[in-house]
Amino acid sequence: MASTTLSATPTPSQLSAAKNGAYSPSRALLGKTARGLYPEKEMVSRKVTCQATSIPADRVPDMGKRQTMNLLLLGALSLPTAGMLIPYGAFFVPPSSGGGGGGIVAKDAVGNDIVAAAWLKTHGPGDRTLAQGLRGDPTYLVVENDRSLATYGINAVCTHLGCVVPWNKAENKFLCPCHGSQYNNQGKVVRGPAPLSLALSHCDISEEGKVVFVPWVETDFRTGENPWWS
């Protein structure tokens, strides 16, 4: 009968193992039966082991690649915040040709010289709009309530970590979207973490009627102290 063939004659090596207690025909039979009952599990196990041991070394990301991936992920998560600053994007990278010693003609967002009379026709009382100022820094031109141009410009670079601070007309404040710093309508800090008020520059009008920014080196009229930026 077929069942009588299950008891196979042990090999010499198996007989030797049996003397040491490491082999018995019943154990061999059970091992063969188990492998016969679960062939699929054995194949899956072999397949997984094969995949795990066959990954080329150049496909395993090193630390540099992982750091790059983390930075890309951080950038993707930062996109909603960056969207809040799109109207101010033209002022994030100052032009390299900006001078710092003397006065400089103010320029609008597309790089055109700002003419005071034309500016005041399109910007009403209380307006605060960005222009390119000293060293190319984004600087607010301030329109007074009598529709004249204020004699000072307000540097828009936050004194905390350098974000461009938007003007919030409804709040009558400059509100930094990065970390919550606040400045009053003249740029004086009223809430941290920013440690200092926004820098000032003189805002003059040239003989040609153009707006000119000049470094402010006198006492800060908002604090009564020497200007920290000079």
UniProtKB/Swiss-Prot annotation:
Reactions listed under catalytic activity: 2 oxidized [plastocyanin] + a plastoquinol + 2 H(+)(in) = 2 reduced [plastocyanin] + a plastoquinone + 4 H(+)(out)
Main localization category: plastid
The enzyme's E.C. designation: 7.1.1.6
One Pfam family of this chain: Rieske
Source organism (scientific name): Fritillaria agrestis (Stinkbells)
UniProt-recorded name of the protein: Cytochrome b6-f complex iron-sulfur subunit, chloroplastic
Purpose of the protein: Component of the cytochrome b6-f complex, which mediates electron transfer between photosystem II (PSII) and photosystem I (PSI), cyclic electron flow around PSI, and state transitions.
GO MF annotations, alphabetized: 2 iron, 2 sulfur cluster binding; electron transporter, transferring electrons within cytochrome b6/f complex of photosystem II activity; metal ion binding; plastoquinol--plastocyanin reductase activity
Low complexity compositional bias, start-end: 1-16
InterPro entries per record: Cyt_b6_f_Rieske, Rieske_2Fe-2S, Rieske_2Fe-2S_sf, Rieske_Fe-S_prot, Rieske_Fe-S_prot_C
Other facts: This protein is 1 of 2 subunits of the cytochrome b6-f complex that are encoded in the nucleus. The Rieske iron-sulfur protein is a high potential 2Fe-2S protein.
Necessary cofactors: [2Fe-2S] cluster
Transit peptide: 1-56
Cofactor binding annotation: Binds 1 [2Fe-2S] cluster per subunit.
Residues noted as binding [2Fe-2S] cluster in the record, renumbered to the chain: C158, H160, C176, H179
